[in-house]
Amino acid sequence: MELAKKIGFNLKQARKDKGLTQKQVAYKFKMTQQQYSRFENGVFELNYQQIIQLCELFEITPNDLFLVD
């Protein structure tokens, strides 16, 4: 699995673990649900600032996003 898709998968799991919807997360980051969905689907890659902000929101570390099974 390519890295962007794996990060997206881990992002989705972290969001679900927090009980949040894509729409709720997108609202916090001032983007549409469709835009946020592209991160979870590995279509768009996250920049450093986005990674840090999402990790803070989901209470995970950047390493958690990059873990590959």
Task: Please provide the spans of the model-predicted regions.
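A short, Lys/Arg-rich alpha-helix, primarily the initiator
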Residues: 1-17
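Short alpha-helical DNA-recognition segment
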Residues: 19-38
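Short, conserved catalytic or interaction motifs in soluble domains
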Residues: 41
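DNA major-groove recognition helix of helix-turn-helix/homeodomain DNA-binding modules
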Residues: 49-64
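Short amphipathic recognition helices of helix-turn-helix/homeodomain-type DNA-binding modules
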Residues: 65-69
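Alpha-helical residues within the helix-turn-helix
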Residues: 16, 27, 56
